[in-house]
């Protein structure tokens, strides 16, 4: 069996190791589903494939992905202003995603609004770094910081049950998420995991981190309904931790 996926970046190697071929695709509601996709006879790992039949694709100067085809939606209901923000007069849909396109295969870099621009003018995709960090079984959440900063840092949320079991084997006493996160040995463990993730980043790497002292919670407004971290909310809520890294 083959599987076509089109959500957040998936961990392809995990599925492949189970003998399940994964073919990534790309699309959005305004695009009427799929714009690009890999197929069994034409696939390139790390990309979301090639444009579907009848679909035109190009990148704007800032790297934003633009698509045009007969299936692009006509506009938002009774909201002409919002429609003009995403569809130009030539019918190109501005997706809000930044990508890399070689004329054949498309690679998604990040959401345009999430791209970090460091004080040195370097554009950084936080989600790519965050996904590398979260491959660690000990780390549940990673929020990369660095917009208009001299270096990258991260806020880290632990995978409580796994870290707790690790701590028990090390005879590290703890009773709450907070005191487990604040334990020096746990923080050393997490730093080692971040260093492993840094090995996959050729240029900018995480230089400092701070531990979140509570689990992120949808009811507290930290997460979306689909359990994605709300970057701006978290950065505001934990601004003291962030500023401490840049003292």
Q: What do the predicted segments below correspond to?
A:
Residues 141-143, 150, 191-247:
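Conserved C-terminal "lid"/linker of ANL adenylate-forming enzymes
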Residues 72, 105-134, 163-183, 202-204, ...:
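Adenylate-forming
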Residues 27, 41, 70-71, 100-101, ...:
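AMP-binding (ANL) adenylation modules
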Residues 51-118:
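Conserved ATP-binding/catalytic segment of the ANL
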Residues 15, 57, 104, 133, ...:
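Residue-level signal for inorganic ion chemistry
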């Amino acid at each position: 069996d083959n599987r076509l996926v089109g959500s957040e970046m998936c961990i392809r190697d995990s599925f492949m190791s189970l003998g399940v071929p994964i073919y990534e695709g790309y699309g959005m509601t305004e695009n009427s589903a799929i714009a690009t996709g890999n197929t069994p006879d034409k696939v390139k790992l790390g990309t979301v494939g090639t444009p579907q039949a009848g679909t035109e694709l190009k990148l704007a100067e800032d790297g934003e992905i633009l698509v045009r085809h007969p299936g692009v939606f006509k506009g938002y209901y009774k909201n002409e202003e919002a429609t003009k923000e995403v569809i130009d007069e030539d019918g190109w849909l501005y997706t809000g995603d930044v990508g890399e396109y070689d004329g054949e295969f498309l690679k998604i870099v990040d959401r345009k609004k999430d791209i970090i621009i460091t004080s040195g003018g370097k554009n950084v995709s936080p989600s790519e770094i965050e996904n590398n960090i979260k491959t660690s079984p000990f780390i549940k959440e990673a929020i990369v910081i660095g917009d208009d900063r001299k270096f990258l840092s991260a806020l880290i949320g632990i995978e409580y049950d796994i870290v707790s079991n690790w701590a028990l084997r090390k005879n590290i006493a703890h009773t709450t998420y907070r005191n487990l996160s604040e334990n020096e040995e746990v923080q050393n463990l997490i730093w080692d995991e971040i260093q492993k993730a840094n090995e996959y980043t050729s240029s900018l790497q995480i230089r400092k981190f701070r531990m979140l002292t509570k689990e992120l919670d949808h009811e507290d407004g930290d997460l979306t309904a689909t359990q994605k971290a709300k970057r701006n909310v978290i950065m505001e809520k934990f601004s003291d931790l962030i500023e401490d890294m840049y003292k």
